[in-house]
Structures are given as C-alpha cells and as structure tokens.
A protein has these predicted regions:
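In a subset of proteins, long, contiguous C-terminal domains/tails are tracked
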Residues: 201, 206-226
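Structured, solvent-exposed acidic/aromatic patches
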Residues: 1-40, 102-103, 120-136, 149-161, ...
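An aromatic- and glycine-enriched ligand-binding surface/loop that stacks and positions planar moieties
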Residues: 1-95, 213-216
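Short, well-ordered loop/turn and helix-capping segments at boundaries between secondary-structure elements
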Residues: 27, 82-85, 149, 168-172, ...
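Bilobed periplasmic-binding protein-like "clamshell/Venus-flytrap" ligand-binding domains
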Residues: 188-204
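Flexible, polar/acidic helix-loop-strand segments at domain edges
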Residues: 66-136
Length: 226
C-alpha cells in the first residue's frame, strides 16, 4: 500500500518503507562514491541543516508551483519551502523551523540537521536519505495512464481508482474523470524533485509529439511573477 504520510517518504527514519520498491541505498557518513552528496546541492540555507555547510540556489519555477492545486499543501510543502511554511521536524531543538524566504527553495531531499532525528548522519555533501528509483505511487499512476490509453477521458474503473488513491494521501478531492493533462499534472506534482520528470516528458513526446510540443511551448519559464 501507499505509505501513510507523503512527507515521511523523505525522512531518514522512513528509509525502506513499504512504498519503496527500488531505491539507491547510500552509506550514512560514507566515503565519496557511496554517500548521498545531494544535500549540499539542494538545501538553500544552513539553518535547515543544523549549521552544516550547503550552497543551493535552486528555486521552484512558477510553472512547477502552478501545477499544485490550492489545497495540495501536503505535497507542495514536502517538496518546496514556500513562505511561512512551518516544519516541526527541522531545528527540533529550537521548536521547529519556519521558512521566511520570499522564493520557494528545495525541501525534498533536505531532512534537517544531524540532531533532527537523523542519528547524527548529516554532514556537508552527505545525507542518509535513500534515493527512490521506483515507489508504489509510480506504479499506480502508470496504471492509470495505461487505462486511459488512447482515449480522451477515463471516467471509472481501477485506473481512476489508482490515481485517486494517490490523491487521497495528499488530502485533495478525488477526480470523477481524468484526461492526459491530469496524468501529466499528477505525475509532475507527485514526483517533483525525484529526477523522473525528464524521462516522463521524453516518453510522452514519443507518444504524442504535437501535444507535448505545444505543452513545452506554453510553459512559464520564469521564477518570479511581476
């Protein structure tokens, strides 16, 4: 079954949870080549990492943030730090952490500092988090896409139910029907910052090139809105 809480998928103590089907198993505090170095490239400030040196300047694009429905705060806040978001499991000794930036920095892949329930396994360029290759939500959404097939709309059946189970965990309303556009959006939101969006886009382009070219040409490329 899907893991109960979406944000828990990206915490060290929840590595190898029942939803994790294939994952890269890094060595906590391991040597170069067997350690997860992404922490320094993802975290935007050292407050979130308990003073550990990090240097990311990556931000969520406007186009990505626009994929989230208004009520989809669970997945959004587990993936990006949006202004005013509170994380009780980061900076635990100080009562939690509230993001006060004016852009949306990366949260997924940033589990906090050494003392934030991470057993001390946080160093610069060294995180204990597994890297997902395949989790059950991917199987569910792939199944939904297969059930939609070449049809314009899917209005029922196990494929729609599979997609709605993913939405249930995010505590957002169920869909009564889905289209190809819904599949794209759901996958982008569910797997944002899990390094699979490019592969999805290439696959979809080979299937529906005209649709995807139009999709690419109408994406918002900026990081700010005037």
């Amino acid at each position: 079954a899907l893991y109960d809480r979406y944000e828990d998928l990206f915490k060290y103590k929840h590595n190898n949870n029942p939803e994790s089907l294939i994952a890269m198993q890094w060595v906590p505090l391991g040597d170069w080549g067997v350690c997860n170095t992404l922490l320094a490239d993802l975290a935007g400030n050292s407050t979130m990492t308990g003073g550990i040196n990090v240097w990311s300047s990556y931000q969520a694009s406007i186009d990505m943030l626009q994929q989230y429905e208004v009520g989809d705060t669970i997945r959004r806040n587990a993936t990006f730090c949006t202004p005013g978001t509170y994380y009780p499991y980061i900076c635990i000794a100080n009562g939690g952490y509230t993001y006060d930036g004016n852009t949306s920095s990366i949260k997924k892949g940033v589990p906090g500092g050494p003392d934030d329930d991470n057993d001390g396994y946080i160093q610069s360029m060294n995180s204990p988090l597994n890297t997902y290759i395949l989790r059950l939500a991917d199987v569910y959404l792939t199944y939904a896409e297969a059930c939609l097939g070449n049809n314009e709309e899917l209005t029922g059946g196990p494929g729609l139910e599979a997609l709605n189970l993913v939405r249930d965990r995010a505590c957002i309303p169920r869909k009564k029907s889905i289209t190809f556009e819904d599949i794209i959006r759901e996958r982008r939101v569910e797997f944002s910052m899990e390094y699979c969006n490019w592969y999805d886009m290439v696959s979809w382009y080979h299937w529906r090139p005209d649709y995807m070219l139009n999709y690419f040409q109408n994406q918002h490329r900026g990081y700010t809105v005037d």
